[in-house]
Amino acid sequence: MQCGGWMHEEHTADVLVIAYGRTLEEAFENAARGVYEVVTDTSRVEPRRRVDASIEGIDLENLLYRFIENLIAYTDSEGLVFGLFRVCKIECNGESCSIVASAWGEEFDPSRHEHRTIVKAMTYADMEIKEENGCWRVQFVVDI
């Protein structure tokens, strides 16, 4: 078992993203990075534009869904790809969860960015968020 980073596994016509972190915030950051590694080589994305997000969800799963879907919306509407992610905090009370996060990236430039696959949407398929032995594991499927 690893505790940090992300990985992809084959999952029919979709991509299963599995992300890890020592904190829930780090696992969400790695989940976002995992999604954008499906799209391009994130190490080549310059942090030219910052996007801030303050998002609420009814539970952790809904929060993860809305967080990733928010990033995908910027890609769809403005052509942005992201390579750096910072989740400042995730809080849950009995009624809802919230996240405060930032992502840095730039417009996709085919002369500098590798075109891999278009991520169409976030899904709830195979979604799991759990903590085990001091390591958070976040798993979900994106539609490509």
UniProtKB/Swiss-Prot annotation:
GO terms for molecular function: calcium ion binding. Ca(2+) binds at residues 14, 143-144. Pfam families: Archease. The keyword Metal-binding applies. GO terms for biological process: tRNA splicing, via endonucleolytic cleavage and ligation. Keywords: Calcium, Metal-binding, tRNA processing. The keyword Metal-binding applies. Belongs to the archease family. PANTHER family: ARCHEASE (PTHR12682), PROTEIN ARCHEASE (PTHR12682:SF11). Activates the tRNA-splicing ligase complex by facilitating the enzymatic turnover of catalytic subunit RtcB. Acts by promoting the guanylylation of RtcB, a key intermediate step in tRNA ligation. Can also alter the NTP specificity of RtcB such that ATP, dGTP or ITP is used efficiently. This is Protein archease. It comes from Aeropyrum pernix (strain ATCC 700893 / DSM 11879 / JCM 9820 / NBRC 100138 / K1).
